[in-house]
C-alpha cells in the first residue's frame, strides 16, 4: 500500500498538495502490483500542468472502453467500436477485409482479394490483385488487372488469363482464354480477344486483335484495323488487316490494305494486298490496288502505282506505273502501263512504256509501246513501238516501228520501220520495208531492200 500523507499540518483545505506531502508517488503509478497503489478520486479531478507517462509502462490489454474528449475539454468514456466512423471515412472494405471501395459516393462491387476501386461509379472488380482508378461501368474480372478510367471498359475472365491493362477510353474489351500481358491504351470499341499473349492496342476506334495462336500483336491507332497473325503490326490507317496463316505481317498506314504470310510489309496506300501460302518478306510501299499473290511468292516488291500485280513470283519487282504484271522470278518492271513479264521471262526487265511484253528469260525491253520479246533465247528491244523478237533469239532491236526479228541467232535491227530480219547473224541498220533472209547479211538503210 502507498504510505500515508506526511506533513499533514501543512495541508490546508483549498490548497495544493505538494509532491513532498506524499511518499512513493512514483511507485504508485509504476509498480507491477497496481492494486496496492489504487488512487480513487470522488468529484472532479483537474490537472493544470502537463501529465507525462512512460510509454513502456502502459498496460497493453484489450478493453471495451476508451477515454475521449470534445471541444469543451470534458473527458468521456466511450466504446472502442464507436471509433469506426463509417460515415466520414472516404474508403471502406468491399466484400471482405482484403479489398477497398469508395465509401462516400458511387455504387461499387469489389469481390477480389487485395483489389482496389479508387473512384468513379458502378465499377466492378472480381479478380484478385486488381485496380480500377476511376470512370463508370468498368469491370476487371481477371487477376492482376488494371483499368485507369473511362466508360464501360472490360477485362473479362478467361482460363489462365491475367495481367492485363486498359488505361482509359470507352467500350474497350480484353477477353478470352490464355490472354496475358495485354494492353489497350484508349480509344473506343477496341478489342483484344482469343489471343495467347502480349497483344497491344494503343488507341483508335473499333480495332481488333484476335486469333487462337501466337502473340506479340500490335495496333497503334486508326479505325477498324485487324491483326490476327502472330507478331503482326498495324501502325494506323483504317480497315487494314494483317491476317493469320503466317507471322510478322506489317501494315504502316493507309486504307483497306491486307497481308497474309510470313513477314509481309505494306507501308501505306489503299487496297494493297500481299497474300499466299508461302509469302515471305514481300513488300508493297504504297499506291492503290497493288497485289502480290500466289502459292509461292518470296521477297517480291511493288513500290507504288495502280493495280500492279506480282502473281506467284519470287524476287520480282515493280517500281510503279499502272496495270503492270511481273509473273516470273527475278523479273523487273520499272513503270509505265500494262507492261508484263510473263512466267517464262525469268530474270527479264521492262523499264517502262506501254503494253510491252517480255516472255523470254534474261530479256530486256527499255520502253516504247507494244514491243514483244517472245524468242527462245535472251534478246533486247530498246524502244520504239510494235517491235517483235521471236524465233531463236540472242537478237537486238534498237527502236523504230513494226520491226521484226524471227530468224535464227544473232540478228539485229537498229531502227526504221517495217523491217524484217529472218536470217542468221544478219544486220539491218534502218530504213523501211527491208528484209533479210540469208546468213551473215547486212542492209544499212534504204527502202524495200532484200538480202
Predicted regions and their residues:
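Periodic small-residue-enriched repeat registers in elongated scaffold domains
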Residues: 83-451
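Extracellular "spike/adhesin" assembly and maturation modules
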Residues: 1-80
Amino acid at each position: 500500500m502507498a504510505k500515508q500523507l506526511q506533513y499533514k499540518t501543512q495541508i490546508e483545505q483549498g490548497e495544493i498538495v505538494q509532491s513532498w506531502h506524499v511518499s512513493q508517488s512514483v511507485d504508485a503509478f509504476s509498480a507491477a502490483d497496481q492494486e496496492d497503489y489504487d488512487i480513487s478520486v470522488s468529484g472532479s479531478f483537474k490537472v493544470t500542468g502537463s501529465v507525462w507517462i512512460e510509454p513502456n509502462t502502459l498496460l497493453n490489454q484489450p478493453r471495451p472502453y476508451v477515454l475521449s474528449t470534445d471541444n469543451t475539454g470534458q473527458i468521456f468514456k466511450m466504446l472502442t467500436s464507436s471509433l469506426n466512423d463509417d460515415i466520414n471515412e472516404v474508403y471502406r472494405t468491399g466484400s471482405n477485409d482484403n479489398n477497398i471501395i469508395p465509401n462516400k459516393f458511387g455504387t461499387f462491387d469489389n469481390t477480389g482479394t487485395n483489389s482496389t476501386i479508387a473512384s468513379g461509379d458502378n465499377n466492378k472488380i472480381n479478380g484478385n490483385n486488381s485496380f480500377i482508378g476511376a470512370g463508370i461501368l468498368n469491370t476487371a474480372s481477371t487477376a492482376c488487372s488494371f483499368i485507369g478510367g473511362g466508360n464501360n471498359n472490360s477485362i473479362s475472365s478467361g482460363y489462365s488469363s491475367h495481367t492485363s491493362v486498359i488505361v482509359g477510353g470507352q467500350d474497350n474489351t480484353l477477353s478470352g482464354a490464355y490472354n496475358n500481358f495485354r494492353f489497350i491504351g484508349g480509344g473506343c470499341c477496341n478489342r483484344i480477344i482469343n489471343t495467347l499473349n502480349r497483344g497491344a492496342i494503343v488507341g483508335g476506334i473499333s480495332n481488333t486483335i484476335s486469333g487462337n495462336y501466337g502473340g506479340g500483336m500490335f495496333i497503334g491507332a486508326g479505325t477498324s484495323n485487324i491483326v490476327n497473325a502472330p507478331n503482326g503490326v498495324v501502325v494506323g490507317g483504317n480497315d487494314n488487316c494483317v491476317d493469320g496463316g503466317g507471322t510478322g505481317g506489317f501494315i504502316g498506314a493507309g486504307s483497306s490494305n491486307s497481308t497474309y504470310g510470313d513477314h509481309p510489309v505494306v507501308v501505306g496506300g489503299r487496297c494493297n494486298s500481299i497474300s499466299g501460302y508461302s509469302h515471305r518478306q514481300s513488300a508493297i510501299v504504297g499506291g492503290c490496288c497493288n497485289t502480290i499473290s500466289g502459292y509461292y511468292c518470296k521477297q517480291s516488291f511493288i513500290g507504288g502505282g495502280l493495280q500492279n500485280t506480282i502473281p506467284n513470283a519470287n524476287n520480282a519487282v515493280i517500281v510503279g506505273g499502272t496495270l503492270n504484271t511481273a509473273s516470273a522470278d527475278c523479273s523487273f518492271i520499272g513503270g509505265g502501263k500494262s507492261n508484263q513479264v510473263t512466267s517464262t521471262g525469268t530474270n527479264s526487265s521492262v523499264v517502262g512504256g506501254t503494253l510491252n511484253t517480255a516472255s523470254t528469260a534474261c530479256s530486256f525491253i527499255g520502253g516504247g509501246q507494244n514491243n514483244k520479246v517472245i524468242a527462245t533465247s535472251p534478246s533486247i528491244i530498246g524502244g520504239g513501238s510494235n517491235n517483235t523478237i521471236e524465233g531463236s533469239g540472242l537478237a537486238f532491236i534498237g527502236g523504230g516501228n513494226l520491226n521484226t526479228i524471227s530468224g535464227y541467232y544473232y540478228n539485229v535491227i537498229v531502227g526504221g520501220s517495217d523491217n524484217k530480219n529472218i536470217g542468221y547473224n544478219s544486220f539491218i541498220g534502218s530504213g523501211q520495208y527491208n528484209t533479210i533472209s540469208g546468213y551473215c547479211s547486212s542492209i544499212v538503210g534504204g527502202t524495200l531492200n532484200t538480202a
